[in-house]
Regions:
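Terminal low-complexity/charged segments
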Residues: 1-208, 285, 367-378, 443, ...
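Active-site bordering "gate/hinge" segments
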Residues: 128, 161-195, 203-548
Length: 548
């Protein structure tokens, strides 16, 4: 990274560097940030924005931007802050990385930081009449300020931008989300095909979709806010309550981040068990995705078939973890208990049964003339768009984007197994559907290799020795893994509090589904309103993972 640091120093002489951590940290003043960001993307190839993390450092408010060069897989992070707590403002980078649009709105919602030149400076999760910004350290949580309201939000069509002219003057410009002549319909929040409480305000021209405004936050539970008053062990529980079809993966990611901060070496057997549980959960998730997508298109029979195989996986979870979905199995240093003696045999049996039924899934639906007509060529997301909107996982790979974290930044024991990264190139609903079925074959391939490794595993150490009271040193860490729907990222910051029951200073989850809904408008535009449901189903988002 030394050459990158030199180039950044040339581009921005005011930049400060810290290379002592895992990733190069670049601190820049806000007035230089946009120019540097443009150079980082266009000259240095940092074309992928992993996360925008808002942080209140008490003496300042700001963001940590995590960036990746998708060609070299180099990563760095940039810190930009302001000391103005009354009217905190930073310059937007949503014109450079489209994913920053929703992420900066989230930062504004929770920290009150306005982004100059952002096209739509509305809150994202909380009501428009919410008082205060909950993740600020000076937030007043008095329930009288924000009572439970049973009325609709006022002025939901109003938004604004802070526009900066060539002289640096910033003017607030009031705007409307939809024009007066647009015909807008509501899809959700209580609609079966939104797969939860999510709302699409949709502008249509005849049968064609012209614009989709995503309205989320109906089940926002404030997981990141609650984490500020929990110990690290207690935070593990809430990590499973986001994407319930990737519960083990989310918990695995948080454990890895804490273990990285403490320098804990996890026993080989424990990592092997973790990886097997991850892949079993990936299989279960892709089976559910198949069932839901077929149901959304009226194929009721096909919907029920994958539930038969999912029961095999849930039986394994229940027998070895004591629960079927939110297993609370990973812990800091390993797993909470060893697997049962017949675990490997059960996994092998499940792999054999699921593999035998994959051709049946294709026979039921993949060649159906109605399915082909509704999915082929609809909801197209190009590779460039996938990178720009930071859409990874199966959706990104269906657009030709090589983005599997298990390959690009191997964690756990993925560098010890042989598997293929499944990549398609059309980027339409059909490729997204087909890719998940193909990925199931690779998960089975990984699981069989893991079973062979378990047979040869010596000893039964399933957890490292860790302190009873977890205390992290002062610093910040970022960890990502490949979850069912894309990369889940965990940002963790500690202030080094010496108190016995130390709590995270800042814990942020960069959920894959939050990025997926960022392309709903893009993929649905100029498609038939009837196909909107199919397109969004092929994105395979989970509402609690969006809302957190």
């Amino acid at each position: 990274m030394a050459d990158i640091q030199e180039k950044i120093a040339e581009l921005c002489p005011d930049a400060q560097f810290d290379a002592t951590g895992e990733l190069l940290l670049v601190t820049v003043p806000d007035e230089k940030w946009h120019d540097l960001a443009k150079a980082l993307k266009e000259q240095l190839g940092f074309d992928y924005l992993n996360a925008v993390v808002g942080v209140d450092w008490k003496d300042s408010l700001g963001c940590m931007y995590y960036l990746t060069n998708t060609e070299t897989q180099d990563m760095l992070h940039v810190k930009v802050a302001t000391t103005d707590r009354e009217k905190p403002r930073l310059h937007t980078v949503s014109d450079l990385w489209a994913v920053a649009n929703f992420q900066e709105r989230e930062v504004y919602d929770f920290f009150g930081i306005e982004f100059i030149n952002h096209p739509d400076m509305r809150r994202f999760f909380l009501r428009t009449d919410w008082v205060g910004h909950p993740l600020r350290k000076d937030y007043d949580a008095d329930e009288k300020l924000n009572p439970i309201r049973l009325s609709s939000e006022p002025n939901e069509d109003d938004t604004y931008s802070l526009v900066e002219d060539a002289q640096g003057n910033v003017t607030r410009v009031e705007k409307k989300v939809f024009g007066a002549d647009e015909y807008v319909i509501n899809i959700g929040p209580q609609h079966p095909s939104t797969h939860g409480v999510l709302r699409y305000r949709t502008s249509i021209d005849g049968e064609l979709v012209k614009k989709v405004d995503v309205v989320s936050g109906y089940i926002h539970r404030g997981i990141e806010k609650m984490s500020e008053s929990l110990t690290y062990q207690q935070c593990l529980l809430y990590s499973e309550r986001m994407d319930y079809m990737a519960a083990h993966m989310n918990r695995h990611c948080l454990c890895l981040c804490i273990e990285k901060a403490l320098g804990i070496e996890v026993p080989h057997r424990a990592e092997l068990i973790r990886m097997m549980m991850d892949e079993l959960m990936r299989l279960s998730s892709h089976l559910l995705s198949y069932g839901c997508l077929t149901m959304d298109q009226g194929a009721t029979t096909a919907f029920f078939y994958p539930f038969r195989e999912r029961e095999l996986i849930y039986d394994i979870f229940d027998k070895n973890c004591g629960a079927r979905m939110s297993m609370s199995y990973d812990t800091i240093g390993g797993v909470t208990m060893d697997v049962q003696p017949d675990f490997v045999a059960d996994v092998r049996h499940a792999c054999d049964v699921i593999e035998a039924h994959i051709p049946e899934y294709h026979k039921l639906f993949s060649g159906n003339v109605i399915a082909l007509g509704r999915m082929k060529g609809t909801g197209v997301l190009t590779k460039e768009q996938a990178v720009n909107y930071a859409v990874g996982g199966p959706t990104g790979r269906a657009s030709g984007f090589h983005c599997d974290v298990r390959k690009t930044h191997p964690y756990s024991l993925y560098n010890e197994v042989d598997f293929d990264e499944v990549v398609y190139n059309n980027g339409d609903s059909y490729d997204r559907y087909m890719l998940r079925l193909k990925e199931m074959e690779q998960s089975i391939k990984i699981l069989r290799q893991c079973c062979d490794m378990m047979d040869k595993e010596e000893g039964n150490e399933y957890c490292a020795k860790v302190p009873k009271l977890i205390k992290l040193p002062k610093g910040h860490w970022y960890q990502q893994i490949e979850a069912s729907r894309g990369p889940i990222g965990v940002y963790l910051e500690s202030d080094g509090d010496p108190k016995p029951f130390q709590k995270p200073y800042r814990l942020h989850y960069q959920s894959p589904c939050f990025n997926l809904i960022g392309v709903v408008d893009l993929t649905c535009k100029d498609n038939l309103i009837a196909d909107l449901i199919t397109i969004t189903a092929s994105l395979d988002y989970v509402i609690p993972d969006i809302d957190r």
